[in-house]
Amino acid sequence: MTYNIVALPGDGIGPEILSGTLELLELISKKYKFDYQLTSYDFGGAAIDSHGVPLPDDTLNACKNADAILLGAVGGPQWTDPNNRPEQGLLALRKSLGLFANIRPTKVTEGTSHFSPIKESRVKGTDFIIVRELTSGLYFGEPRHIDNQSALDSLTYTKKEIERIAMVAFELASQRKKKLTSVDKENVLATSKLWRKTINEISHEFPDVKVNHLLVDACSMQLISQPTNFDVIVTENLFGDILSDEASTIPGSLGLSPSASFSLEGPRLYEPIHGSAPDIANQNLANPFGMILSLAMCLRESFNFEDAASELEQAVYQLIKDGKTTKDLNGHYTTSDIFNELKKNY
């Protein structure tokens, strides 16, 4: 079988962290004996410059026909039109592909615990996943309205939308420590009341998974005070956006966190959670670990190469443990240095 992979370098540091990651992919494919076809397309700000829009039709069509999509980063200060921003391309891509589930792991290993702004004894052993609903809620609700005197956003969830994200979370939890935390604001919001009711109904299909409900404000506190207590967290779009960014501070750098976006069928999108960092673009300073770990997620989730994924992850964590890191992690290694070190494993 030949896997069809679409690369979206995007903006800022995106092209440099993705290009090195694709070189690693080539070496990994030879070691693990699989074939793939790779095509690269403009996306985000780069596509605005070349095509006038952040998500050109040819890019979207290629993504629809892919087995997996690897994205570098989008955005930058030079694209100022509020009606034609790079980030709108990402929202449109998620919607077009039905990428309703965003998966963000947060892991603190022996080599990374000292980077955390939180006391090392509190974060050591942290290993949880946030499952965020990605295509509904406040960000997509209608009607919406703004004028000089008032503004309106609409928060809407259907039972079906809650059921499908819950199934993803329960299945992940059943493969891990069998512990699921559902986060809502059930004491105030009608959507959260439906959310909690639906989670409880689906829990009967997974009797081995222990379900705990937390209000979002309590969860935001416990993520910092007791991060090792969590395994899988499931929540709606806005809450997930905030909590996953909060969680990304636990390992000590945005550059350490990968993510994946899933649909029920079709391609999955893999990307680091950090932004495009235009201030350090093209200077060989970017931390590529989040992009590399996103490739590991791709190998595991889209291609079922568990051994290849684990080997790559362990190689990254060993580099960090050995102090072979970029400037943001108090190291002196360049972006290309990191890739060259990892290539030695293949």
UniProtKB/Swiss-Prot annotation:
It catalyses: (2R,3S)-3-isopropylmalate + NAD(+) = 4-methyl-2-oxopentanoate + CO2 + NADH. Mg(2+) binds at residues 217, 241, 245. The keyword Ribosomal protein does not apply. GO terms for molecular function: 3-isopropylmalate dehydrogenase activity; magnesium ion binding; NAD binding. InterPro entries: IsoCit/isopropylmalate_DH_CS, IsoPropMal-DH-like_dom, Isopropylmalate_DH. The record marks 139, 185 as: Important for catalysis. SUPFAM superfamilies: Isocitrate/Isopropylmalate dehydrogenase-like. Pathway: Amino-acid biosynthesis; L-leucine biosynthesis; L-leucine from 3-methyl-2-oxobutanoate: step 3/4. Substrate binds at residues 94, 104, 132, 217. NAD(+) binds at residues 76-87, 275-287. Homodimer. Catalyzes the oxidation of 3-carboxy-2-hydroxy-4-methylpentanoate (3-isopropylmalate) to 3-carboxy-4-methyl-2-oxopentanoate. The product decarboxylates to 4-methyl-2 oxopentanoate. This is 3-isopropylmalate dehydrogenase. It comes from Staphylococcus haemolyticus (strain JCSC1435).
